[in-house]
Design a protein with these regions (language model features):
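Glycine-rich phosphate-binding loops of nucleotide-dependent enzymes
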Residues: 1-145
Length: 145
């Protein structure tokens, strides 16, 4: 399989169950080990060995299963939002919860996320609002892919 995505394009993978959509996305994100092939971003070949390396390279993944792979349901919306963005909100091991909440508020407005407060448990949100929180945390990262 080969494909190219240009800056600003929205790219989706479609297919029947078992066709390899999820596996392909997980390979690109570094969640599964790649046996062959290459991933190139901005002309540079990436050798991703983990999701952490993928995130650092500007790659994110909106999972199919937000409940088990996209959110920590027992944690607050703010905490879920902050997880992939700790490098932006933490300093010397302390999280600046005010900055984290302010950044979240921007996305809550833009995506029209319905919640009572940033400290509301992610598990109590509707499915659509949970998915918006997953999207918000990656939008905050300004991911490339």
């Amino acid at each position: 399989m080969s494909f190219s995505v240009r800056r600003g394009e929205i790219f989706g993978i479609a297919g029947l169950v078992g066709a390899g959509r999820t596996e392909t996305a997980r390979l690109i994100f570094g969640a599964d080990r790649r046996e062959a092939g290459i991933i190139t971003l901005d002309g540079k070949t990436l050798r991703l060995r983990s999701t952490r390396e993928a995130v650092a390279a500007g790659i994110c993944l909106l999972t199919e299963d937000r409940k088990t792979q996209g959110l920590v349901l027992g944690q607050s919306v703010r905490e879920n939002f902050g997880l992939p963005n700790l490098d932006s909100f933490a300093w010397l091991g302390f999280i600046d919860q005010k900055r984290e909440a302010e950044a979240l508020e921007v996305h809550v407005g833009k995506l029209q996320i319905k919640l009572s407060s940033a400290d509301q448990s992610a598990g109590t949100l509707s499915g659509g609002n949970q998915q918006k929180v997953v999207l918000a945390k990656w939008l905050e990262r300004n991911a490339e892919v």
